[in-house]
Amino acid sequence: MNKLFKILLGLLWAVPLWAQPCSFSISGYITDESTQKPLVNVHIFIEELQIGSFTNELGFYEIHHICSGNYHIRISHIGCETLKVFLPVTETLTFSKVLHHHAELIDEIIIHGEKQNNTTQSSQAIKKEEIVLKGNKNLADLLEEITGVQSIKNGSGISKPVIHGLTGNRIGIINNGIVQSGQQWGNDHAPEIDPFVAHHISLIKGTGALAYSGGSLGGIVLIEPKELDNEPHLHGQTHYITESNGRGHTANLQLEKKSKGFSWRTLGTFKQSGDTHTPDYYLTNTGKKEINGAFQLESHFSEKWKSNLYYSLFTTENGILRGSHIGNSEDLQQAIRAPKPYFTQDDFSYSINAPKQKVSHHLLKWKNKYQFSDKIIGEFIYAGQINNRKEFDVRRSGRSDIPALSLLQTQHTIEGLFTFQLNDRKSIKTGIQNQLIDNSNNPETGILPLIPDYNSIQSGIFGIFQQQKNNWFYEYGTRYDFKHFNVVSISRTNRSIERFNHLFNNFSFSAGIKHFTTEHIKNSLNIGWVSRSPEINELHSNGLHQGISGIEEGNKNLKQEHAFKIIGTTDIKINNHLFIQVAPYIQNINDYIYLQPENEFRNTIRGAFPVFSYQQTNARIIGNDVMIVYEPTENLKLNLRHAYIKGDDTQNKTPLIGIPAQKLFGSISFRLSDKIHWKNSTATLNGQYVFKQNHLLITQDFLPPPPAYFLLGTQLTTQYQLKKSVLKWNLRVENMLNTTYRDYLNRLRYFSDEKGINFIMGVSYDF
């Protein structure tokens, strides 16, 4: 009896000991990222316990009776991408989050996982869910989701972004904090970046991005991977996309985990497609193939010192439309006016033959971040890049497998960046950046190179001051860049070696102001002065540029460009239903460098090609970007975007060539109510009208601009929630009316129509 009493007494004492760890709770607020308003009926769910709660009208939730342990929290809301967070619980916690319910209007900049809302720069971001949905596209095509951005193309698989009428060397592409190197001068040289590596793609349209690079007159594109999570379990994503036009396939796998002492992430991507199809014929030899990969490793040596190692590989092989390479000038002029390209085949093929491109790009980055004190943070970065580009022409005597252009570029970057937090409302960011480039031609081509061998040294220093005072935010910045070219070229006349040295000193300044006029109105103004040195192709190109099917002639006497730009932005939010953003801008560019088509077709042993030469003038570009989002109910959203731009040669009183036409885009989206397992089901109908570029003289190009066109598309998306994973489906139709059209910004519009109807299906699995 005494023994039984002791056992019962022990059990009574044990009950509160067992129950005590399950007395914890989690509570917090869920708000909208762009409006800062509370979100109602957000579901917060603990996967391991299969319990959850919904937010009330204040955006508040509570979950009780939680034991000590590690949990995966799933946060879902209609119209938002489901958020999954790993949360260790050892006590009662306050856990609040923001969701991207109106992602169209988010103007934050995500840099290494940190939101930079305190900036006057005009910016917008593309979120991970959009990148995954359209992962079969390249970077430039993805950026067209942002108002004011279009693409200059060289066929169906090669494109690069045009921001406020500027492209190429005037656009800075920042890949994980490093200026993307390579042969960026060519309009047929698409950025060698796999969009799947990015968690956010941010676009800064102002001139205030002095911390990244000098000479970016058009804007800055930031490609930012996701910060590595503090998650001890293996997680990942797999994506597959197939499309009918070109019979393309895209596959991607991503894995990440926190191991003892470090965290890691790896991913791989494979893409392949064949000849695309217009409504009437195949575009022969327009296939492409990509194999890409990336690896990221991060370790915390102490609370103050964090080290990150990143490597990425991008490889691609792109076919160039066979009908764009013609044998003589008479046939070329006939081909330009022909309704159908020469050499068009009647059958589909995955084969990629000459003319074609093969490119590989390696990026290695080592970053160390050290917090010297609560107010001083330093970053020390080394990066190396290797870019190998080969271009193949249709050559006689079976020599098409020998590249006509073979370039190898190595680049080294060293940076030191410091942030000084003077107080809660003032900060200074400063840094010094050094870059060394070695660019050489492989002699295997047997052809005088388009671009000569050269070395380049560039050093830059910048400083940015930011201050917030009541409802006002101020930003001032300055930058100095020193750039030196050492060029070794071969003369076209007597075949002698010629050496040139070019030295440039560039100064850039910016000032910005932002005013939170009311709770619903925000105004910002950014003014900048930017200098840009001419690049190697503008100075010294001399020969056939295969990707544009033309002969380019550089000008060794080109001077620096000097640009003065003003961009204003007004954001208006009314009753959490109507959102309006207006962003007018004007940019004056002295000594603007442009590629002028000459009234000449030149015969060479490689065929007949039009001639282009680099010239300078004074230019003015004005425009306005407008976006309107109306959400009358939680299930219905209307989106309207309009981009107007006009460019003029103020010196010669003529229009600028290569400026995009006006573009109007609209969409209507309907969201279905969430079911037990089915979430975020949306149907979207969209239309795009591109105006004819009438602001151009008929003598300025080989052909007049193509007529205006309208494209209709649709998109269906949904996801199925499993216990600890998510399965997502999407179906898209592009050019669903199978419209025949040509785009002014496609350099191959001289020879062919654009792609016809395209059915795209994608599936993703998050685990």
PLM regions: where:
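Gram-negative outer-membrane beta-barrel transporters
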Residues: Y585-N588, G607-N694
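Short acidic/polar hinge/loop motifs at secondary-structure boundaries
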Residues: E62-H64, I178-G206
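N-terminal periplasmic accessory domains that precede
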Residues: T94-V98, L139-L142, S159-V162, I174, ...
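Short, acidic, small-residue-rich periplasmic hinge/interaction motif at the N-terminus
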Residues: T31, H43-E47, S76-C80, T90-V132, ...
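Flexible loop and strand-edge segments within Gram-negative outer membrane beta-barrel domains
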Residues: S273, P279, T284-T286, K306-Y370, ...
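Outer-membrane beta-barrel translocator/receptor signature
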Residues: G182, V197-H199, L210-D280, T286-G293, ...
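Outer membrane beta-barrel strand-and-loop segments of large Gram-negative receptors
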Residues: L405-L417, G460, E553-K559, K565, ...
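C-terminal beta-signal and adjacent terminal beta-strands/loops
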Residues: S531-R532, N588-D591, L595, Y689-L696, ...
